Amino acid sequence: MAKNNLTRVTEFILMGFMDHPKLEIPLFLVFLSFYLVTLLGNVGMIMLIQVDVKLYTPMYFFLSHLSLLDACYTSVITPQILATLATGKTVISYGHCAAQFFLFTICAGTECFLLAVMAYDRYAAIRNPLLYTVAMNPRLCWSLVVGAYVCGVSGAILRTTCTFTLSFCKDNQINFFFCDLPPLLKLACSDTANIEIVIIFFGNFVILANASVILISYLLIIKTILKVKSSGGRAKTFSTCASHITAVALFFGALIFMYLQSGSGKSLEEDKVVSVFYTVVIPMLNPLIYSLRNKDVKDAFRKVARRLQVSLSM
């Protein structure tokens, strides 16, 4: 019996939707709709930025990478959810689970760093608009983006290595809809204390460090805006940050609830809802957030729409 208990698992069973079998078809349609809208919105945003010369600025350069991350983010998770809901197959191999966790962690970590970079970019634009493109030159922009990806990949390697060096024995049922850190730690049969300290400390550091950069950037932005004499000028200047503030509030709010809040006051169902929100809903909302109140993006979209209309009418 002891020997059986120590057998290493080769696959996991995702139990996230097992409690609601009657909702499988409606959930499939909802997740499929969200996924298609997310891909259309984010890929469309990337293409729009590439084809319109007016959007060749640091702000939209960073936004194109945010859209790329969001498209990848949801593509790591949602196809697995759709396959589970469509086929009823809840089994995921050990290697697939590790790969999903690794890719998901890369996207989440990189997005944290990128949102901090975008906050600094907004400060640079507001502090000295005339020298904005000089200060945020292409070399610096690429360095910041590459730095965000390197930090995201490095963090993912650390978290994945720590998590999957744990022993997973007889119990292989993950009460979640994808391979995320909290349910995997609960499932491990080896001592997780030391590894949890490393993972949680690093994760908290990444979230809090980037949140601090964003907070400092916006404090400096507010300080700069207060120097503007007209109230209309202050409102117009601050409105350029509204989309980014909304995206930051949604993303970091979900991460803080999920990973920084004490687990004693949370239920697993709450974790599932929040996970759906930041892995599926937020990537779908970001293109809308950045385009609805953005005149440049709306003008570029109208221009492309007119070109398509002309080409189709010929």
Curated annotation (Swiss-Prot):
**Location of this chain's protein in the cell:** Cell membrane
Signal peptide range: none
Among CDD domains, the record links this protein to: 7tmA_OR5-like
Those parts of the protein on the Cytoplasmic side are: 47-54, 121-139, 218-237, 293-314
Disulphide linkage map: 97-189
Membrane topology term: Multi-pass membrane protein
Membrane side Extracellular: residue ranges: 1-25, 76-99, 161-197, 259-271
GO molecular function of the protein, one example? odorant binding
Family from the record: Belongs to the G-protein coupled receptor 1 family.
Q: What is the protein's known function? A: Odorant receptor.
Q: What is this protein called?
A: Olfactory receptor 9I1
